[in-house]
Each structure stands twice: as structure tokens, then as C-alpha cells.
Amino acid sequence: MASIAVCPGSFDPVTYGHLDIIKRGAKVFDQVYVAVLNNSSKKPLFTVEERIELLREVTRTLPNVHVEAFHGLLVDYARSKKANAILRGLRAVSDFEYEMQITSMNRVLDENIETFFMMTNSQYAFLSSSIVKEVAKYNGDISELVPPVVEQALKRKFASTAAD
């Protein structure tokens, strides 16, 4: 049986921290579905389509990584992909409590789908999409935080916002 994982997130925008988890997951699992969600509790900077495009660009050298949008319950999406795992990145202990609640709920919904936590590389432990957006908004240097294509997309996005 193939090992198939779903790596969910809003990826608004994708950072080197996200990419670290995706690349490492691609070494462990036969197939990884990066599931881009539209979180209604967050106001995204990039549309789902833009986030998918950026993710596809930065993962194009990973043949076993697929990027798609999803809505609804994560376990339903995982089942639709015949996934037996959910892959989640952890930056710090503070992430764990929230992730544990989500994992426990997912186990109630489908006990056959396991959740795997991967600690992000220590150089990205502080990194979040929110921090990246805040630094980019004020023209700070984000070149060590996101891939070049994402850096350019952020510059365009904030240039157009400033022009409005």
C-alpha cells in the first residue's frame, strides 16, 4: 500500500518553513497532497488560486507533491485522496496544544488516518506567514524567509495595495 499524506494549511503565503516540511514529507511519503484551505476566520492576502500557483511553482521539482484546494473537513479530503496520513509542521511547543486538539478531533472522525508531526528546521522556528506579511508590508527584507517567486508576489501585492 502506498503511503499518502495530506499536508494542509492556508499558505498565505508559503514560506521556507512550509517548504521545509513539504520537502521532508516528500522524502518520507510516496505521495504528498498539499491541501490549500480557505480559512474563513482569516482574511487572506492571496486568493486560493494565487496560493496554489505559488505552491506549484516552489514544489515543481518534487514529482510526488501535488497542490490542490480543499474545503470542508480535512479527513474527508484525506479519504478522497486515499491518504493514510496527515502531515503537520510544528514550530514550537506552543503549536502543539492546538494541533493536539485538531488531531484528536480528526481521530474521532476517522481513526484510520494518522497524524504525523514534523518539527520544522530550527532556523524557521520563528517563521509564520503573518510575520512575513508584516515585514513585507513595510518593505523589509524577506529574502531569507520565502522563495524568490513569493517575495516578488508579495512586493506586487503590497505595491498595488499602496496604490489603492
UniProtKB/Swiss-Prot annotation:
Entry's Gene Ontology BP terms: coenzyme A biosynthetic process
Subcellular compartments: Cytoplasm
GO annotations of cellular component type: cytoplasm
EC nos: 2.7.7.3
Domain of life: Bacteria
Transition state stabilizer (site feature) positions: H18
Pathway info: Cofactor biosynthesis; coenzyme A biosynthesis; CoA from (R)-pantothenate: step 4/5
Cofactor names: Mg(2+)
Positions that bind substrate: S10, K42, L74, R88
Amino-acid positions noted as binding ATP in the UniProt annotation, renumbered to this chain: S10, F11, H18, G89, L90, R91, E99, Y124, A125, F126, L127, S128, S129, S130
Keywords, in A-Z order: ATP-binding, Coenzyme A biosynthesis, Cytoplasm, Magnesium, Nucleotide-binding, Nucleotidyltransferase, Transferase
The UniProt record lists the keyword Transferase: yes
Reaction(s) the record says it catalyses: (R)-4'-phosphopantetheine + ATP + H(+) = 3'-dephospho-CoA + diphosphate
UniProt GO molecular function: ATP binding; pantetheine-phosphate adenylyltransferase activity
Record-linked InterPro entries: Cyt_trans-like, PPAT, Rossmann-like_a/b/a_fold
UniProt enzyme class: transferase
NCBIfam families xref list: coaD_prev_kdtB, cyt_tran_rel
Protein role: Reversibly transfers an adenylyl group from ATP to 4'-phosphopantetheine, yielding dephospho-CoA (dPCoA) and pyrophosphate.
Family to which this protein belongs: Belongs to the bacterial CoaD family.
Subunit (UniProt): Homohexamer.
Protein name: Phosphopantetheine adenylyltransferase
